[in-house]
Amino acid sequence: MSRRNKKRSRRRRKKPLNDIQPGPSKSSAQDEPIKSVSHHLSKIGTNPTLAFILGGNEDLSDDSDWDENFSLENTLMPLNEVSLNDKHNSKHFNKGFDNNTALHEVNTKWEAFYSSVKIRQRNVKVHFATDDILVDVREADDIDRKGPWEQAAVDRLRFQRRITDTEEILSTVFLRKKLNPMEHE
């Protein structure tokens, strides 16, 4: 087996990350298992780095440098006192700058540049209509829209009315036959 194959075989034999224990170079506080909720779920409690990432290092939080009595006002500068651009004084920055004049100047330069550009016309295969009104809008109840579907709808309503009318007449006849079957034979 060559040297390269030996290295590959060694790499395959390494333990998975969950079984790795802290090395002897770690401090004694990190060698002890951390007691937390994550300790019961898996072997994460024995690895202080994973416990710290997952928030299970409650026992190590006693050596914190944070003082609850110290206010945040003394540590963090308020954002309204911080200048984003110290090089320019904001009072004198826009002095002599008129938005309307600058906009007019930019537009004049733009028009002068593009008026000097020669645009040659090409033969185009697509032509658009020159009319102002390209779409003709009609109301939904226009006579032009009437068709065979409307006749079918009228026929359907007429037949429904006939069925209800004949049902009233025939129901009384059938009810009499049902009540007195001997009388009608």
Swiss-Prot record:
Q: Does the keyword Transcription apply?
A: no
Q: Does the keyword Amino-acid biosynthesis apply?
A: no
| InterPro entries per the UniProt record, alphabetical | PPP1R15, Prot_Pase1_reg-su15A/B_C
Q: For the region Disordered, give the residue spans.
A: 1-38
What biological-process terms (Gene Ontology) are attached? Answer: regulation of macromolecule metabolic process; regulation of primary metabolic process; response to endoplasmic reticulum stress; symbiont-mediated suppression of host innate immune response; symbiont-mediated suppression of host translation initiation; symbiont-mediated suppression of host type I interferon-mediated signaling pathway
Important for host CHOP inhibition: where is this region?
Answer: 126-128, 170-174
Give start-end positions of Basic residues composition bias: 1-15
Keywords from the UniProt entry:
Host-virus interaction, Inhibition of host innate immune response by virus, Inhibition of host interferon signaling pathway by virus, Interferon antiviral system evasion, Late protein, Modulation of host PP1 activity by virus, Viral immunoevasion
What is known about its induction? Expressed in the late phase of the viral replicative cycle.
> What is annotated about its quaternary structure and interactions?
Interacts (via C-terminus) with host PPP1CB.
Give the family per the record. Belongs to the asfivirus DP71L family.
Protein name as it appears in the record: Protein DP71L
